[in-house]
């Protein structure tokens, strides 16, 4: 049976109106996304009063970061016909679920590890076309293949942007009309969940709103976070920098041999001298996933194409603990998989996305300027 491609919506107008268009167009997926994460709080024993109090605390943090984000979420909620709290939950699910688990006496912290992911950037000097190529495999719950979407936002106050995101979310990975692109990977350290901070998805959204690469870097490097995360930034001007972020500090990693490759373990020697790596029990295969991608890219030659990056991301070494992860039981009994493969060309404003790539090799090309096109199988 053919796997459904991710639906696309293009929105414009003021924040609330953009959100309303989004929620209306993708009502069923937004509801499914809300149910997926709301169910987790139910399983942790949260009644409606406790759930609302927990989510409102994060809404306050988001509003301080940017009130327009809350306006857009209100529009999504109204368009989809779901409570506002549910949309906040989608956008702060990492932080909300982690806080709920810490408050639940009987919760196993390994029940719901965060996103996996393997990301890479091919710089201009290694690119066959002379243009940056930026991509990622997103590893998470297999059912998110049925809740994720591609969103295009037409803005009057900054660059348009394109993002692959869970329905109801404001951003995950993506690129904008100024040539800035971002992907992000799960990291964990002993500094996590000790301070208030901005939900990670909102920081990624902030990046996509920036006209200048320097301001995108500032959003990543200086915004306080609740938890660690790796954020990989690139620009159509030819540069990429990876930031391994602790909640209160960021550690840059620069390209080597025209490449940046990152999985889910800390690499910065400075970071490792200052904090403790705590995420490996959830993602032990991270230690070879980035090595495999780099090796395959180097073997492909001195000049690389989008097809070379796709081929590296389709790697099955160590399956099912591979770069391209087939659906397999996760630690909580749910199915875990590479939900999507995303390949971006920031200079062209295009993003090619394949759902469940271990089972499917059909990509759809999404664009800042054109309608989506389904491509021939890779």
Explain the meaning of each model-derived region.
Residues 203-208:
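Short, well-ordered beta-strand elements within core beta-sheets of diverse protein domains
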Residues 93-202, 218, 339-343, 351-353, ...:
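Internal mixed beta-strand/loop scaffold within catalytic domains of large alpha/beta enzymes
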Residues 1-116, 209-252, 256-378:
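C-terminus-biased signal that marks the final domain/tail of proteins
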